[in-house]
From Swiss-Prot:
Species assigned in the record: Staphylococcus epidermidis (strain ATCC 35984 / DSM 28319 / BCRC 17069 / CCUG 31568 / BM 3577 / RP62A)
Name of the protein this chain belongs to: Phosphoglucosamine mutase
Entry keyword annotation includes Metal-binding: yes
Active site: S102
Keyword check for Isomerase: yes
Reactions the enzyme catalyzes: alpha-D-glucosamine 1-phosphate = D-glucosamine 6-phosphate
Cofactor note: Binds 1 Mg(2+) ion per subunit.
GO cellular component, one term: cytosol
Role, per record: Catalyzes the conversion of glucosamine-6-phosphate to glucosamine-1-phosphate.
Protein's gene: glmM
Length: 451
């Protein structure tokens, strides 16, 4: 991570950390690095946003910065992050930009870039933009007169994206009753249109954005509301998206949550059966449940683990030419169809498996037995020394021996806070909690703030 760019673009409290002034600079410098300096006089740039009240303010500043470098901007309006990624590649734009802070609260916002290939930026590209941000007044081109280009609205882009998503499945969803939770964000209108066009009987919650209620007790980070709605409406299943539509969490007909691991397993199993799973491999992160790996092993499907973060999943998928990967949190990447996590795409693929199999979502999900998980955060003086602490390693070895293959331990430094995260999966809830606490006690005793 750099000074401005985190693992998913530039984020901060809107109008405090992510100001219009910074948005203008990101537009100007990002447009120069990723488009103008490649020789295009008027590179095409697509700009989308989620439903946050600060989105229009930042959008105006960003577009001004892009136009100041000579870009031809097409404003997509409210659309999902994967929608921007898809359209950037499909329309051969030089650059795509999404204004969103994903699943974060309404006060936050963010700006993320996509290259002409639809992928997020490389570290080198982000560093080049950061170097310009740190200069007082970089000497960059300033078109004048007839060389300044109008921006245009291209709200039809969302429909183009939805038409593409419909084309990725071979069946309609007639006979399926589905509850959709748009997190009062980017998918609030997209999801009902998509599943309605595919002839599903839909109910909606979290699809009435007012600029302030994005992710508020709804969406993929609060699936309990969706579970209630599925039971109340006697629906076949429910799908919850996050604020910018790159995550999905499902709920089965019994109101039980079906997370990203289970969704990956269900879709991966179908792809494997149809000989469509590249390398017979699914890429996940170290946070995926032990039950996920055991279920894959039973099916004869291989797995590859990365660090936490969808960008690392995508990097590994590109390296090995794999076409399915994701995170327990619901970032699912189906590389045959899009370059980034796509909640709507994953949703139609999951619904397609349910429709074609004739099985309920609970039946499909039950093939993967989730191990109970316990997570404890310990505040420490130096989180990066946990791997070399002999006392921590000793207790981890002791616990692993006791679990005898029926559990998993993950002890790692937090990426954003002075914490060590202790995660244990075991055969029972009691075992997971007991083992996690025994490790956390040693971490706190040997590495805590008073040490």
């Amino acid at each position: 991570m750099g000074k401005y760019f985190g693992t998913d673009g530039v984020r901060g409290v809107a109008n405090q950390e992510l100001t219009p002034e910074l948005a203008f600079k990101l537009g100007r410098y990002g447009g120069y690095v990723l488009a103008h300096n490649k020789g295009e006089k008027h590179p095409r740039v697509l700009v989308g946003r989620d439903t946050r009240v600060s989105g229009e303010m930042l959008e105006s500043a960003l577009i001004a910065g892009l136009i100041s470098i000579g870009a031809e901007v097409m404003r997509l309006g409210v659309i999902s992050t994967p929608g921007v990624a898809y359209l950037t590649k499909e329309m051969e734009a030089a650059l795509g930009v999404m204004i969103s802070a994903s699943h974060n609260p309404v006060a936050d916002n963010g700006i993320k870039f996509f290259g002409s290939d639809g992928f997020k930026l490389s570290d080198d590209q982000e560093n080049e933009i950061e170097q310009l941000l740190d200069q007082t007044n970089p000497d960059l081109p300033r078109p004048v007169g007839e060389d300044i280009v109008h921006y245009s609205d291209y709200f039809e882009g969302a429909q183009k994206y939805l038409s593409y998503l419909k084309s990725t499945v071979d069946v309609n969803f007639e006979g399926l009753k589905i509850v959709l939770d748009g997190a009062n964000g980017s998918t609030s209108s997209l999801a009902p249109f998509l599943f309605g066009d595919l002839e599903a009987d839909t109910e909606t919650i979290g699809c009435n954005p007012d600029g302030y209620n994005i992710n508020e007790q709804c969406g993929s980070t609060h699936p309990e509301k969706l579970a209630e709605a599925v039971l109340e409406t006697e629906s076949d299943f429910g799908l919850a998206f996050d604020g910018d539509g790159d995550r999905i969490i499902a709920v089965d007909e019994n109101g039980q949550i079906v997370d990203g691991d289970q969704i990956m397993f269900i879709i991966g199993q179908e792809m494997y059966k149809n000989q469509e799973l590249n390398g017979n491999m699914i890429v996940s992160t170290v946070m995926s449940n032990l039950g996920f790996y055991k279920a894959l092993e039973k099916e004869g499907i291989q797995s590859n683990k990365t660090k936490v973060g969808d960008r690392y999943v995508v990097e590994e998928m590109r390296r090995g030419n794999y076409n399915l990967g994701g995170e327990q949190s619901g970032h699912i990447v189906l590389m045959d169809y899009n370059t980034t996590g796509d909640g709507l795409l994953t949703g139609v693929q999951l619904a397609s498996v349910i429709k074609m199999s004739g099985k309920t979502l609970s039946e499909l999900a039950s093939q993967m037995k989730k191990y109970p998980q316990s997570l404890i955060n310990v505040r420490v003086t130096d989180k990066y020394r946990v791997e070399e602490n002999i006392h921590v390693q000793e207790i981890m070895t002791k616990v692993e021996t006791e679990m005898n293959g029926e559990g998993r331990i993950l002890v790692r430094p937090s990426g954003t806070e002075p914490l060590v995260r202790v995660m244990v999966e075991a055969a029972t809830d009691a075992d997971a909690e007991r083992y996690a606490q025994s490790i956390a006690d040693v971490v706190e005793d040997k590495m805590g703030l008073d040490k």
